[in-house]
Amino acid sequence: MFAPKFILVPTDFSEHSDKAIRQAADIAEQNNAQIYLLHVVDKLQQCAVDYCIPIETLEKLQLDSEKEARRKMEDEVQKILQSKKIDVTFDVKVGIPFAEILREHVERKADLIVIGSHGRTGIKRTLIGSVAEKVMRESKCPVLLVR
């Protein structure tokens, strides 16, 4: 039987991510596993088509986004620890979400990724793309997709 010991749970703070966190917490509790919550803040671009943001403003916006994400992650961890007796750590990274998730999975030797999916199909999925789908295709470990 598969018994993961280190579970990577990417979150974007959506309802789907909350479901994935709850599922991962149940799995962790049953297997005495550690949960690693990860949020990736998209790296802000300084320039758009015809406008550039001053670098100081961009850096402040990026820092504010990271601080807010860390605050939300601390809240998520507290919610988990109120109902489960499991080991939970977290981090906030800046970059391309699917790439950072895959990098963290390899670096931390995760043996399971539990990720929420919005469930879009058809043209919406094609236009918007799916972090969960990219993670599923590229991951070297099992991925549990939670809807």
Model regions and ranges:
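Structural beta-alpha unit
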Residues: 1-2, 30, 78-113
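Small/aliphatic-rich secondary-structure junction motif
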Residues: 2-55
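Active-site phosphate/pyrophosphate- and oxyanion-stabilizing loops and adjacent acidic/basic residues
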Residues: 25, 78, 133
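General small-molecule cofactor/ligand-binding pocket signal
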Residues: 38, 89-93, 144
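A short acidic, glycine-rich active-site loop
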Residues: 56-71
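Short beta->alpha linker loops
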Residues: 68, 92-96, 118
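Gly/Ser-rich helix-loop-strand patches that form or flank binding pockets
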Residues: 103-147
